[in-house]
Amino acid sequence: MATGFFWDEHCFWHAGGNYAFLLHVGGLVQPLAAGGLPESPETKRRLKNLMDVTGLTAELAAQSAPPATRQMLQRVHPASYLDAFKSVSDAGGGEIGHHAPFAHGGYEIAALSAGLAVAAVDAVAMGQLDNAYALSRPPGHHCT
């Protein structure tokens, strides 16, 4: 068997806004590089690029996965949370919790991120892979 590597370029497109660490930019708060959030696409993109140039990606079962379905998401999140997230996402973005900013399309990217993790776990649980890693973002650690 093999090691799975689940990733999708679209996950790198998640945009959290312009921050200086956890502070909104403006007034006396100056923006930092890469949008100013500790979690940024650049660290993930660099990892993927290094995997590619060293040949590691070619040795893995690299693949994408479909987004998590609404039914999958509702196993973890209440429908009201998902409805609010989708509504704010469609309206151009905002925050859906404490320090959980996202831009337009953030709901779809978050569903894709969750789908990558679900697919990785499923492939290992079904014996299709020995182990797997999902390089996904947003990480989802602020979801309620």
Question: Would you name each region that the model predicts?
Answer:
Residues 1-144:
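HDAC/HDAC-like amidohydrolase catalytic core signature
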